[in-house]
Amino acid sequence: YKIGNENSFINLKKIQKINDKKRIHFSLLKKDYSFNSFLIGSIQIKNLLFAVLAAYLSGIKIDTILRNIGKIKPINGRLEQIGKLKNKSRVILDYAHTPDALKTVISNIKEDYPLSKISLVFGCGGDRDKSKRPLMGDIANKYCDKIYLTDDNPRFENPKVIRDQIKRKIKKKKY
């Protein structure tokens, strides 16, 4: 099962942004449907469409699916909006702990809020894959406007050493 072409069981046709919600237009077995969602990012919309397909193939009626799919909330810590500041900035939480996950999260936020600046608060855990630290710093440097490094459970490593490994790829003016 895949999303993206007319020959798929399910095909994402359009995502229409309306304030903080999205209207998701899709086809299932070549018939058009739509529903509303408050989830952030195309990755979560794709997951919703796969949930629609799984429910449908399990025998649940499409009307029942459409009535309920928009009620799905984000998983705690996965592209979860946890606040809004006075200046209308959004605070979005995600537990991205690999370079690929961090890049996916940032690109999904940029898709949804293309005119917004992105400030990132993150760190890397200690006693874990040290090679990912500069990679994550590089991703943050490329895709974020401001970076705030923090400690993320350094375990038995020196927190400053971890931060320095991340900072190697970050321009000074960004953090």
Descriptions of predicted regions:
Residues 16-23:
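A short, compositionally biased
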Residues 5, 125, 152-154:
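Short, ordered loop/turn segments at secondary-structure junctions
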Residues 7, 19, 86, 154:
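Residue-level detector of flexible, active-site-proximal loop/helix-junction positions
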Residues 1-6, 15, 82, 150:
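Conserved beta-strand termini and adjacent loop/short-helix elements that scaffold enzyme active sites
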Residues 171-175:
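Short, intrinsically disordered, charge-balanced linker/junction segments flanking boundaries
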Residues 149-164:
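Redox- and metal-dependent alpha/beta enzyme cores, enriched for Fe-S-associated oxidoreductases
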Residues 18, 28-146, 168:
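Nucleotide phosphate-binding/pyrophosphate-handling subdomain across enzymes
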